[in-house]
Amino acid sequence: MISVNDFKTGLTISVDNGIWKVIDFQHVKPGKGSAFVRSKLRNLRTGAIQEKTFRAGEKVEPAMIENRRMQYLYDDGDMHVFMDNQTFEQTELPGDYLENELKFLKANMEVQIQTYEGETIGVELPKTVELTVTETEPGIKGDTATGATKSATVETGYTLNVPLFVNEGDVLVINTGDGSYVSRA
């Protein structure tokens, strides 16, 4: 059991028949009454975000999440196929399960598949990915203010803002957390 006083961002817990990841938390000590911990939790099965308040010192059950290193192979209609690098066992996940991750997934990419008691509950991408620009308008030279950007589409179909010097065929490093341009590879 873990005390709510020991909460950390990213901690996974089992509360109310659900698996939750702590997104944010705050220890509150009111002038009158006992202290409590206000937390924001994400349900790892549904993706729903919920705010929950715990009494200070309350105990919660930790959720033992197993991370398996897997390789993304291909999409088969609405199903996406991953292969375990050690056992060569293949796992299929539905497309709606990978809503945000699909923007950055390409064949042969290494990802972490998160499982809880044999059930797949999440896919963790690397912090950054390298994707090739397939479409962008040419940059216009002239007197532009610093930080001028244009729109570019990468090989997965994801569209983002990039600096004017980026051309079609360039390989970009993209942050998977917020989908922003980091640099050219």
Swiss-Prot record:
Pathway named in the protein's UniProt entry: Protein biosynthesis; polypeptide chain elongation
Principal place of residence: cytoplasm
Protein's UniProt keywords contain Cytoplasm: yes
InterPro entries noted in UniProt: Elong-fact-P_C (IPR015365), NA-bd_OB-fold (IPR012340), Rib_uL2_dom2 (IPR014722), Transl_elong_fac_P/YeiP (IPR020599), Transl_elong_KOW-like (IPR013185), Transl_elong_P/YeiP_cen (IPR001059), Transl_elong_P/YeiP_CS (IPR013852), Transl_elongation_fac_P (IPR011768)
Keywords: Cytoplasm, Elongation factor, Protein biosynthesis
GO molecular function terms listed in the Swiss-Prot or TrEMBL record: translation elongation factor activity
Entry-linked PROSITE patterns: EFP
Annotated localization: Cytoplasm
UniProt cross-references to Pfam families, sorted A to Z: EFP, EFP_N, Elong-fact-P_C
Gene Ontology CC terms, in alphabetical order: cytoplasm
Classification via Gene3D superfamilies: 2.30.30.30, Nucleic acid-binding proteins (2.40.50.140)
Family: Belongs to the elongation factor P family.
PANTHER family assigned: ELONGATION FACTOR P, ELONGATION FACTOR P (EF-P) FAMILY PROTEIN
Name the record gives this protein: Elongation factor P
